[in-house]
A protein has these predicted regions:
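Processing junctions and N-termini across compartments
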Residues: 18, 135-138
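The canonical Cys-X-X-Cys-His
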Residues: 137-149
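Bacterial N-terminal signal peptides
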Residues: 9-17
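Extracytoplasmic c-type cytochrome modules immediately beyond a signal peptide or single-pass transmembrane anchor
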Residues: 27-136
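Bacterial N-terminal signal peptides that target proteins for export
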Residues: 1-10
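Sec/Tat signal peptide C-region and signal peptidase I cleavage site
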Residues: 18-24
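Short Cys/His-rich "knuckle" micro-motifs
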Residues: 152
Length: 152
């Protein structure tokens, strides 16, 4: 009986240890993935802005808006509970994200839909609509950054 209790205790400790390691890895992975993703959509946004400022053919950067939209759809999953600045993690994500997760997720969805509008305008080479959609997309980025991202 005593041996069974010891074995059960050791097994429970092993399960907790493995689960803890998996959680730490998944939190670190989430942080790394979202940082890489935000860097990529920042670059995509810059390319769209450059094309808008140049005033030429916009169709060449329509795929960049699609990248922004696709990433917007992934954002909610990249902010699982416990993936903030805990345990020395290097992230600018503020607790407000998880305190108001439904609002945060909704803002990501809005950003994605704004980027869809941007993609359509770019594909149509409609400079006026593209400029308006670009403002909508980047404005929505700011709607999340202000309450949810710590300054550098």
């Amino acid at each position: 009986m005593k041996t069974m209790i010891v074995k059960a205790t050791l097994l429970a400790g092993l399960v907790v240890g493995v689960a803890g390691a998996a959680w730490a890895q998944s939190a670190a992975d989430a942080i790394a993935q979202r940082q890489a993703g935000f860097k990529a959509i920042g670059a995509a946004t810059g390319e769209v802005k450059k094309a808008l400022d140049a005033g030429g053919d916009l169709t060449a950067v329509a795929a960049k808006a699609a990248e922004i939209s696709a990433y917007g759809k992934r954002i909610p999953a990249l902010f699982p509970a416990g993936s903030g600045a805990v345990g020395g993690a290097k992230t600018r994500a503020l607790p407000a994200i998880w305190e108001n997760k439904s609002d945060f997720d909704a803002n990501a969805g809005i950003m994605s839909r704004e980027a869809d509008k941007l993609e359509m305008a770019l594909k149509a080479n409609d400079k006026v609509a593209a400029a308006a959609a670009f403002a909508g997309t980047t404005g929505q980025c700011g709607a999340c950054h202000r309450p949810a991202r710590a300054p550098q």
